[in-house]
Structure formats: structure tokens, C-alpha cells
A protein has these predicted regions:
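N-terminal accessory regions of S-adenosyl-L-methionine
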Residues: 1-113
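Structured loop/turn residues at beta-strand edges in well-structured enzyme cores
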Residues: 130, 149-152
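Conserved SAM-binding motif I beta-strand of class I
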Residues: 153-157
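Conserved class I S-adenosyl-L-methionine
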Residues: 130-138
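Conserved alpha-helix/loop element of class I SAM-dependent methyltransferases that forms part
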Residues: 110-130
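Conserved SAM-binding loop of SAM-dependent methyltransferases across substrates and taxa
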Residues: 139-150
Length: 157
């Protein structure tokens, strides 16, 4: 993860949690995140950082987090060709959990996180205006679904 991505994420986190019960933990969390993201604990971290660096900065005009297929952006938002975008996404394979559609490109995943969501959602209380901590969040699929269900904050570690 590049420092600019980390800084952008953390600036948004600081702003979102200001005045909340999480505010006292901001400094400790920042130090932990920095230590985690800049360590080389995962064998493919360097490879994935390099793949991330090849992607253009994209700003989705549309996203839908409330459906089984999480959609982020549309093909018309791409600043490179669809073929180039698909080739760059292959740098992150294998895609373990989904389903996702990124800027018009369907990501074929090994596991269906939507099936798990469909099983658990009838058994959880309303997430409206809640702050949710998802321990072991993996790729964030369920965080997106929690936000779409009205969570004020969904934080995955």
C-alpha cells in the first residue's frame, strides 16, 4: 500500500470517528496500521503493491453496495481501455471472495460472499447508524454490505 493511499484512508477515518467512541484510539490505530501495511509480512505484498501502482486513479460516478454483486464504477469511468484494465486486475489474482464488478469488469471469485451474507443478515439486528467492527474482514465484501445496510461506520481489521 502506498503512503498516499494510507494517508487518504486515515484522513477519512479520523474525520469520520472524530467525536465518537473510537476517537481515543486514533493514534494507536494509526501506528498499528502503519506497522502492518509497511511490513513485508505477506509473501505477495510487494507484488500487489506494484500491481496497485499500475492502476490509474479512477473515480466511480456510480456504485451499488446493496446488491449481491457489488458494483463500483462503470466502464465509461475508465481512463484506459477495458482490455488494459482487465490485464492490470489480473495482477491481483487469485480473487478469493466476491462477487464484484469493477468499472464494468466482472470479477470471477472462488467463493461467494453474497451467499454468506444472505444466510446471516436475517439473524443480525439493524445496522442503521451503527459503528461496526469486522474482525477478520478479508477483502471487505461484508463491510460494503454493512454500509449499504445503513451502518454509519464499518471498520475491518
Amino acid at each position: 500500500m502506498t503512503i498516499s493511499v494510507f494517508d487518504t484512508f486515515f484522513e477519512k477515518f479520523i474525520k469520520t470517528t472524530r467525536g465518537s467512541d473510537l476517537e481515543p484510539f486514533q493514534d494507536e490505530l494509526a501506528a498499528s496500521l502503519e506497522s502492518h501495511f509497511f511490513s513485508k509480512r505477506h509473501g505477495r505484498k510487494t507484488e500487489w503493491d506494484d500491481a496497485l501502482a499500475t492502476l490509474p486513479k479512477l473515480e466511480p460516478k456510480h456504485f451499488d453496495l446493496g446488491q449481491d454483486l457489488i458494483q463500483i464504477g462503470e466502464n465509461s469511468d475508465l481512463t484506459i481501455s477495458t482490455e488494459d484494465f482487465k490485464a492490470k486486475l489480473k495482477g491481483f489474482m487469485p480473487w478469493r471472495k466476491g462477487p464484484y464488478e469493477l468499472f464494468g469488469t466482472n470479477i470471477n471469485t472462488e467463493w461467494r460472499s453474497d451467499w454468506k451474507w444472505q444466510r446471516i443478515v436475517p439473524h443480525i439486528s439493524s445496522l442503521q447508524d451503527k459503528q461496526v467492527l469486522d474482525i477478520g474482514c478479508g477483502n471487505g465484501y461484508h463491510l460494503f454490505r454493512m454500509l449499504a445496510s445503513g451502518a454509519k461506520l464499518a471498520l475491518g481489521i
